């Protein structure tokens, strides 16, 4: 719906299609393929910035668990939204479909979201440096999120980057596919905490 609305009057994309059905089908296909398929029937470089941003959001959310897709995963985002909704309404538990979600699951969802966001922002920053201002910033962001979510979509700027830029993109693909927590923890040594410290309240917000 969002892609159709933004591209409806764009003559280079949906605006140049002959009938309404073609526009709806092309917009729906482009939205669905952001999950992991990597196909496109519209030239992405002709799309408006708002459409590309919407596609970035879809790619960042990614596919569902146990699938071949990357990204943060749909269940992670769902748990975050439900937890935030409950917090705003003063609920102590996170409840979904009359079932209480374990606090450990909620904590893991927040951790996954935080690490994924930090990874993508870090890769985005480094690739902006490697890009050297050759391309639009939203194009660079699109490439980063597409790589992290292992979608396969692109705006054709990757060949212009140096070896360091391509290496960053490759590592981002691995992190997104394996799972960023698993990828990061594979390089770290976990240890059991033998000391439990006293709690402290910190002002938030």
What are these regions (language model features)?
Residues 4-205:
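Membrane-proximal intracellular helices of multi-pass ion channels
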């Amino acid at each position: 719906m969002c892609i159709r609305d933004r591209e409806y009057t764009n003559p280079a994309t949906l605006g140049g299609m002959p009938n309404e059905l073609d526009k709806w089908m092309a917009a729906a296909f482009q939205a669905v393929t952001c999950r992991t398929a990597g196909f496109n029937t519209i030239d992405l470089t002709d799309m408006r910035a708002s459409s590309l941003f919407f596609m970035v959001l879809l790619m960042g959310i990614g596919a569902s668990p146990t699938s071949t897709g990357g990204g943060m995963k749909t269940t992670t985002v769902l748990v975050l939204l439900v937890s935030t909704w409950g917090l705003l309404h003063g609920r102590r538990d996170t409840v979904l479909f009359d079932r209480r979600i374990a606090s450990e699951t909620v904590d893991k969802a927040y951790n996954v979201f935080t690490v994924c966001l930090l990874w993508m922002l870090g890769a985005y920053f480094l690739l902006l440096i490697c890009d050297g201002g050759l391309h639009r910033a939203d194009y660079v962001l699109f490439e980063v999120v597409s790589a992290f979510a292992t979608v396969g979509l692109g705006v054709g700027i990757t060949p212009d980057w140096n070896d360091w830029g391509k290496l960053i993109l490759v590592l981002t693909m691995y992190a997104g596919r394996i799972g960023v927590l698993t990828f990061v923890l594979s390089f770290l040594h976990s240890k059991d905490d033998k000391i439990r410290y006293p709690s402290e309240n910190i002002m938030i917000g």
